[in-house]
């Protein structure tokens, strides 16, 4: 039994974890945010890094110090039924319903679509989806090979290709960040808007989901002691989030500079294609196609493996390959509704789920303060759940928001919760729930004595 990982293992596992995290949204959202934030990009980028880098790292630390095998075990500290519901919902969101279809559509719209005529778009998206998820299924059949597939091969290739475009773009900028117009949403609350934009990467959710893969990989390298696994998980995570922070910052500033040459695009995928074509023409588009397909494929492999391993844990009557087949077929179908529509549909669900995930992560980190009392977990989560429902409803399309029951909830929330209009209404209730939970916990201890 090994006492710790070798130096090269940290590098490979950190590379694998980065590769698992860095997929579709990680490329397109910071660029689009940069275009809209303009000269306010420094504040917006800082907010983005908090949710897109800070919370995923806290999620890795939470899994490490709690010595949990994954999100289900962590969520049982609230309640076992809640753990089932939360885990299933989380994996459906980052699996077949939103994240996985988004990976295929992003790959297609950035890497393939620019080379096709309009009439070929729909049939070839269907064909591409089959090929994409067929390849991801093939690579996911043996979870023990993930370190080789992603950490040693796909991710280094991705970094080299992306680095090439970033070096060219920053050495010959499209425009000045300081001359870029600040969008309406970013004029008064750039940090907060950047913060909620970071939700779209799904990485705080993914940190909880990928925990099972990281821990399994470290065990495969010969480390068996739970406390040592916890430390090694955090060390490997530090390499991953460091890389993410650097690349996010480069992409967001690239987006802000690009408005010196291009109009703000419908989504970051279009902007990235325009930038690559401007600098390198057809060759640039080919490189970009490779970057995006590799980025999305490696994340798809990780998500499909994590989904299948977790569902075996939740429902052990079926084997790994059964769940792998399900998580290959469903997103292949959903991918055909298009990237912009997938993003639009996912926002209300993310606004509901993210506060619950962040709260769970923070409770796991603060657990020693209140002796990991179930009562504190339950009261804090209950308070957060109320606000998370309102945040999710607030992100619905306007026709649904105008329905009387929903409108009544939203009007009450706007009047009662600070930062609600910015998608942050859950913070006050989460803090209040935590304080009440701790008071009840410590009063019970004193009474019992």
UniProtKB/Swiss-Prot annotation:
It is a multi-pass membrane protein. The chain crosses the membrane at residues 11-31, 46-66, 81-101, 120-140, 157-177, 198-218, 237-257, 283-303, 323-343, 350-370, 375-395, 419-439. One of its GO terms (biological process) is isoleucine transport. Keywords: Amino-acid transport, Cell membrane, Membrane, Transmembrane, Transmembrane helix, Transport. It comes from the Bacteria. InterPro entries: Brnchd-chn_aa_trnsp_Livcs (IPR004685). It is found in: Cell membrane. GO terms for cellular component: plasma membrane. One of its GO terms (molecular function) is L-leucine transmembrane transporter activity. Its main location: membrane. Belongs to the branched chain amino acid transporter family. Branched chain amino acid transport system which is involved in the uptake of leucine, valine and isoleucine. This is Branched-chain amino acid permease BrnQ. It comes from Lactococcus lactis subsp. cremoris (strain MG1363).
């Amino acid at each position: 039994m090994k006492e710790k990982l070798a130096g090269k293992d940290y590098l490979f596992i950190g590379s694998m974890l980065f590769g698992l995290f860095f997929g579709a949204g990680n490329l397109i959202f910071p660029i689009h945010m940069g275009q809209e934030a303009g000269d306010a990009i420094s504040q917006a980028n800082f907010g983005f890094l908090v949710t897109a880098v800070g919370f995923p790292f806290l999620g890795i630390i939470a899994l490490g110090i709690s010595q949990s095998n994954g999100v289900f075990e962590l969520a049982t500290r609230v309640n076992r039924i809640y753990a089932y519901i939360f885990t299933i919902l989380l994996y459906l969101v980052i699996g077949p319903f939103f994240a996985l279809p988004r990976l295929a559509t992003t790959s297609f719209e950035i890497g393939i679509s620019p080379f096709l005529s309009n009439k070929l778009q729909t049939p070839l998206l269907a064909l591409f989806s089959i090929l994409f998820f067929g390849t991801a299924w093939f690579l996911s059949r043996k979870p023990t090979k993930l370190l080789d597939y992603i950490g040693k091969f796909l991710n280094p290739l991705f970094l080299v290709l992306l680095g090439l475009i970033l070096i060219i773009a920053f050495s010959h900028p499209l425009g000045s960040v300081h001359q870029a117009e600040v969008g309406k949403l970013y004029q008064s609350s750039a940090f907060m808007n950047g913060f909620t934009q970071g939700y779209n990467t799904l990485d705080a959710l993914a940190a909880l989901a990928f925990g099972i893969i990281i821990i399994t990989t470290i065990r495969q390298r010969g480390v068996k002691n739970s406390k040592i696994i916890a430390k090694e998980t955090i060390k490997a995570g530090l390499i991953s989030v460091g890389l993410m922070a650097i690349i996010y910052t480069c992409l967001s500033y690239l987006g802000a500079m690009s408005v010196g040459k291009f109009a703000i695009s419908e989504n970051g995928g279009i902007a990235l294609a325009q930038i690559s074509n401007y600098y390198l023409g057809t060759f640039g588009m080919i490189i970009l196609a490779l970057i995006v397909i590799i980025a999305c494929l490696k994340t798809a492999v990780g998500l499909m493996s994590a989904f299948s391993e977790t569902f075996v844990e939740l429902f052990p009557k079926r084997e790994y390959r059964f769940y792998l087949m399900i998580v290959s077929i469903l997103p292949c179908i959903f991918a055909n509704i298009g990237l912009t529509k997938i993003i639009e549909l996912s926002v209300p669900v993310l606004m509901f789920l993210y506060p619950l995930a962040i709260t769970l992560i923070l409770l796991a980190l603060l657990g020693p303060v209140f002796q990991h009392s179930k009562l504190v977990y339950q009261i804090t989560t209950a308070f957060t759940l109320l606000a998370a429902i309102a945040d999710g409803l607030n992100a619905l399309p306007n026709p649904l928001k105008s329905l009387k029951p929903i409108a009544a909830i939203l009007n009450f929330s706007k009047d009662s919760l600070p930062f609600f209009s910015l998608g942050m209404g859950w913070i006050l209730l989460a803090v209040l729930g935590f304080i009440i939970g701790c008071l009840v916990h410590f009063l019970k201890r004193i009474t019992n004595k």
